[in-house]
């Protein structure tokens, strides 16, 4: 559905839907694709590129969009900035989807380590407000992250049904 550039409330609703969907899969993306996850959901602060200290990378991804639509929205100029931020995310998501060896990564041990890591991340970054400093959606996003973990665990429940004790 198209987004009306003069309707910030519609933009916020679409953002919330996209970010919630991302949070549901964050248990896997944060662990198996950390560089892409940082680009998609890193903090809305500039950072220095590790290879060349003289290159400053501006904020990008969901948190930069959050800052734009919840704090800095200007109907005349912000829509183009929003479109650029969102468009930059698309190839990263497409590359993650097409990643050739993605099915080899998901050993049981690594998936359970991803779950452990995700729970730590939710409790240290998610529910503290660091992950959604402007929109203040940290708790709903933490719930979405836990829903993603629950869905993942349901797969393992089917693979390893509980043993019945006699």
What residue spans do the PLM features occupy?
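Mature extracytoplasmic or organellar-lumen-exposed domains after removal of signal/transit peptides
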Residues: 1-166
